[in-house]
Amino acid sequence: GYGIQLSVNSIKLLNKIEFNKFKNDKKYNPEKINFYSIKNSKKICDLNISDFNLEDCKYTTLKRSDLIDFLKRDLKDLIKTNHNISQIDQDNNKIKVTFENNQFSECDHLIISDGVFSKGKNLIMNTNAQPKYNNTLAIRGMISNPSEINCENISLYLGPDFHHVIYPVNSDRDLNFIAIMRYKLSKEEQKNYI
């Protein structure tokens, strides 16, 4: 599974459902983000993200699949899978989510995490945002503990027309890799990605 980075604020929320008991070997708490030039791999600067940590809420990286497994296991009765939202209404302090199968749920809080061009966001904002290709591609994958890469922290390489970030996702120091690059796709090729 690909990686995910969780801020101190998101960990604070997850700890309310006992994320603090999540296995330590399946997550990682990097201390810094190191910024490098992609041209010569020289370090530009760093940001000590551990300065923002609290005792029980630390900036955390892990595999998405491990986070999903945790949520499914501990919240299986509250998480709805294979449901498509058709309507979101808010009245006073309650939120009513209606699904395409005409079932509904009421809640106090709603977290929408369905991507940049989110159907949920469109329903709340009453818009229909569509993706617009801007001649860039994102590539992601996993790397197993290479010796030439700093496995302790987040490494962000910056350059013209190409950036990539590498960060550990567990105590085995498996690394998540994400690259953003300029790349022009034909209209026909774009249909495969939208």
Where are the language model's segments positioned?
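Active-site substrate-recognition segment that forms the wall
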Residues: 153-188
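Conserved N-terminal helical subregion
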Residues: 7-125, 129-142, 184-194
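Glycine-rich FAD pyrophosphate-binding loop
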Residues: 1
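Short, conserved charged micro-motifs
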Residues: 149-150
